[in-house]
């Protein structure tokens, strides 16, 4: 059945397909695009997997894996979408990575969301899971307790997903000179963020968040600025599905959310120009890579461009985001 067609209910009424209908389509069409390269067997009971799609992420892949290992991720389900910079070879040697590859269209696969959905629903049903991009680093109060304690606290509140919007971070120097070493955490270098300018409003699929440095420097029009809302940690039951990277289905679970974490977004580093070139050449990103065209238009006008300005605030740990009003401490009222 085509996922966009209308189906008939038992009493003859016409209805839109359910999440299960939609998922069956994505499984058939998009999971078959993936070539299995390495699999480590079934997930152990209680293990939390993380699904990601990568392409030419050699700069950040090591700190990314190490960050989430420290938080308690037990297995990585990673799709390599045509890397030629050593990313695939590095992942093939990582003992906790299940690895697939494909040269299929990232855009037609829901910007990677359909691949993630297919893998998570097949290999990790009815358990807590994560999904994230390689430049996204989850922080929350009580990180030293790990994801297990965070999940327990969410469950006590009757929540089945974590609202953790993106927060763009950057250094005090130019983007070109913002270099991340293989054993260096990006937040050691990119410690600054815009202290104001975020706006929350209810959207079609949940709480929408716009603003931050990308709106300030690249998207003056609030409506066209990139979406920051994310729910990277979810309980993956039968009705949950990823149809976009920002709003998991069903959307009703995304409303009324309070941010108890943030995804620190380390996009503005020395490899940005190569990312721009790849995005413009392939046209595989949102609106024919509109975001990357905006980056190119702005960065080409000024040498040594830096996002840092007088309204920047320094990240010194999760509680600095609580103090700045960017999230709440989920453990603050627990004994």
Question: Where in the sequence are the language-model features?
Answer:
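An acidic- and aromatic-residue-enriched active-site/binding cleft used to recognize and process polar
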Residues: 55, 81-84, 94-96, 102-105, ...
């Amino acid at each position: 059945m085509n996922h966009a067609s209308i189906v008939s209910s038992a009493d003859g009424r016409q209805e839109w397909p359910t999440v299960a209908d939609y998922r069956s389509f994505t499984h058939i069409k998009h999971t078959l695009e993936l070539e299995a390269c390495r699999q480590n067997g079934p997930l152990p009971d209680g293990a939390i997997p993380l699904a990601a799609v990568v392409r030419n992420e050699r700069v950040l892949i090591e700190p990314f894996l190490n960050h989430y290992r420290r938080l308690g991720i037990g297995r990585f389900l990673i799709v390599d979408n045509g890397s030629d910079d050593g990313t695939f070879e590095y992942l093939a040697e990582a003992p906790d990575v299940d690895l697939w590859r494909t040269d299929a269209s990232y855009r037609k696969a829901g910007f990677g969301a359909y691949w993630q959905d297919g893998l998570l629903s097949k290999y990790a049903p009815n358990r807590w899971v994560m999904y994230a991009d390689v430049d996204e680093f989850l922080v929350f109060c009580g990180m030293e307790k790990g994801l297990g304690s965070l999940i327990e606290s969410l469950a006590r509140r009757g929540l089945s997903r974590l609202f953790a919007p993106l927060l763009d971070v950057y250094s005090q120097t130019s983007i070109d000179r913002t270099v991340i070493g293989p054993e260096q955490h990006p937040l050691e270098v990119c410690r600054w963020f815009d202290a104001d300018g975020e706006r929350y409003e209810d959207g079609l699929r949940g709480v929408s968040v716009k603003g931050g440095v990308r709106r300030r420097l690249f998207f003056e029009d609030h409506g066209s600025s990139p979406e920051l809302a994310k729910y990277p940690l979810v309980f993956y039951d039968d009705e949950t599905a990823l149809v976009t990277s920002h709003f998991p289905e069903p959307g009703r679970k995304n409303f009324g959310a309070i941010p108890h974490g943030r995804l620190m977004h380390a996009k503005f580093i020395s490899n940005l120009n190569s990312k721009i070139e790849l995005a413009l050449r392939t046209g595989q990103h949102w609106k024919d890579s509109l975001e990357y065209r905006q980056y190119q238009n702005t960065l080409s006008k000024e040498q040594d461009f830096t996002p840092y300005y007088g309204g920047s605030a320094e990240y010194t740990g999760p509680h600095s985001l609580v103090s700045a009003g960017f999230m709440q401490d989920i453990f603050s009222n627990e004994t």
